[in-house]
From Swiss-Prot:
Outcome of gene disruption: Cells are unable to produce tetrathionate from thiosulfate.
UniProt xrefs under Pfam families: Cytochrome_CBB3, SoxA-TsdA_cyt-c
A GO CC term attached to the entry: periplasmic space
Subunit and partners: Monomer.
Principal cellular location given in the protein's record: periplasm
Descriptive protein name: Thiosulfate dehydrogenase
Catalyzed reactions per annotation: 2 thiosulfate + 2 Fe(III)-[cytochrome c] = tetrathionate + 2 Fe(II)-[cytochrome c] + 2 H(+)
pH dependence per the entry: Optimum pH is 4.2.
Amino acid sequence: MRGDVRVHTASPIAAAWLLAVGLVAHAEEPPTVALTVPAAALLPDGALGESIVRGRRYLSDTPAQLPDFVGNGLACRHCHPGRDGEVGTEANAAPFVGVVGRFPQYSARHGRLITLEQRIGDCFERSLNGRALALDHPALIDMLAYMSWLSQGVPVGAVVAGHGIPTLTLEREPDGVHGEALYQARCLACHGADGSGTLDADGRYLFPPLWGPRSFNTGAGMNRQATAAGFIKHKMPLGADDSLSDEEAWDVAGFVLTHPRPLFQEPTGD
């Protein structure tokens, strides 16, 4: 393994203040940069490289690697897919590339500034229906190392093309009957007639459950109609991105979200 990755830390509040002052002073929008994934051959040697590899493993195989913190069958890669063995590297599917330079940031859900560590904790509590890792947990540090490696070369505050999940909203209620027909035709083969997903030979979810006790809970971002519709529109069916119309993605999301799932127990600002 070769390459050099320097990790700099600063006070979260100070970093956010400096970023805000810089943006106001220049009176311009943050720059947009291309989504570029580092070559695996450029992983650094030594302890940092080992931490990056562990972080990738935690994000790819989360239930098996961190069973005490995951309450369902989902792994981080199910909402943050990647290619060539990476996680969080695909556009329009909340990629991790550049994410370290966009935190701390204001969270409308919490009504305050939060760190990336806290945002990851949200995902564990909501999307994984589990509990957040302590801020000094070794696995969390490894995940941050992986995200930092993916983000190398991206300026602080820059917007990476394809960041986040583009939301999709139509000015009508979802058509559940149409959504069910589309689900049976385009989704059932992978996710099952009962939405329970498909396991591989090792008992891990090759295709995740979309509802039921092993799926994300009611506090997850994917439980929002606009977010689910946007994800389906841009990333589903697998291998046929953007093959559904806006109307089709909207109705499939509406059908999926009518089904029961674990209840998020904490107060939410969603």
